[in-house]
Amino acid sequence: EQAMQGAADILRQSKKVIGIGSPRASIESNFALRELVGADNFYTGIAKGEQERLQMMLKVLREGGIHTPALRDIESYDAVLVLGEDITQTGARVALAVRQAVKGKAREMAAAQKVADWQIAAILNIGQRAKHPLFVTNVDNTRLDDIAAWTYRAPVEDQARLGFAIAHALDNNAPAVDGIDRDLQNKIDVIVQALAGAKKPLIISGTNAGSAEVIQAAANVAKALKGRGADVGITMIARSVNSMGLGMIGGGSLDDALTELETGRADAVVVLENDLHRHASAARVDAALAKAPLVLVVDHQRTAIMENAHLVLSAASFAESDGTVINNEGRAQRFFQVYDPSYYDSNTVMLESWRWLHSLHSTVQSREVDWTQLDHVIDAVVEKLPQLAGIKDAAPEASFRIRGQKLAREPHRYSGRTAMRANISVHEPRQPQDKDTMFAFSMEGNNQPSAPRSQIPFAW
């Protein structure tokens, strides 16, 4: 309460307050910051170049007219081209799905002989190392090289040129590339043949190569294949868990925010769950923050910028809070709280980032808090940002019940619950009450792990 009042007093006196959001914070938390500082003073906390690549990626997904498969669907593709992205490091689950896709050739051969999918020994015997083609381009070796039909190691610019050359070979209307040597041209012919001959080719790229041209080249290849009538898919991989969501919210880049602080136009800054040193040079970040009379940091882990902070609010991590993120497919995904930290330590003052920011906003405006549960924030997001209307359907509301019961987080066999706090007190306190979701922090409630729904809180 005292910290809120102190911060609110300084914010009221500041001539311009800016907010720096984060691609690892939820939609709700970024939105709460945007509401606190105003849409014009909200910055994404992403470097300018990265943000431009993110916007290009969103443009490709929105306007390209090319299907983006889910992780499970990636396994059904029969030719894969990975352009400039080391997916084993930036999208490990995608890399696993690509491995499965490559093995799909053996499964197809086995299916033709009426061998079931589960008979793995028979499939391996029939397949005899037969694989669907996988082509990988990167600046260095990757951990997918062992199953790739061909790998191309070259500077990022040359990888983009390769992509554009493949697109041109598939479709004459795509821009041509000059100066490609004969050996590389022969390889391009092989790739073109494999992609053109596939029923379901998949193109994978992303922002991690640090090149807008690579993303453009991947889009051109996918478009050229679509023009040939192929059932083509495109997968784009972003850098952080909610990069896509932040791109859809919009706002200035981190470079713009630092310029505001450096020139003195902004004299207070609120940084949300963002280690700014990861997105800009440490010297520039520290110099910019040193100029601001108020630096308020909200985070769940200790970062170097806290050395420059005047006030730090301890936020709940993803395991201790609820929220929504937008994944690389552009699909909204809700994450749910696993436990309440204050149950194990009553001295803990740890709130979700959006609760801290909304509480601060309410204190600044001297009004009552009107977001008391997650659904209220989601309704406010949908009202202000219609492009995010789909987040409401990512999971049922907090009022969802089955036969009047919430869904139990704990299975009936949750042994040792009474002993978990015995070192603190042998008297077991009441279980925490969850007002944000349809789950209960206990065994009490509906418990159907085999029910046909995705809201299952445990694997048993």
What spans do the regions from the language model cover?
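Catalytic P-loop NTP-binding/switch module of NTPases
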Residues: 1-12, 16-22
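Long, low-complexity segments enriched in small/aliphatic residues
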Residues: 216-219, 378-460
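Non-catalytic alpha/beta scaffold blocks inside enzyme catalytic domains
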Residues: 36, 46-393, 456-460
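Short intrinsically disordered, low-complexity coil segments enriched in acidic
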Residues: 1-7, 371, 402, 409, ...
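RNase H-like polynucleotidyl transferase catalytic core
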Residues: 39-42
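Short, Φ-rich (hydrophobic/aromatic) sequence segments
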Residues: 11, 26, 163-167
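Cofactor-cradling patches in redox/metallo enzymes
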Residues: 20-30
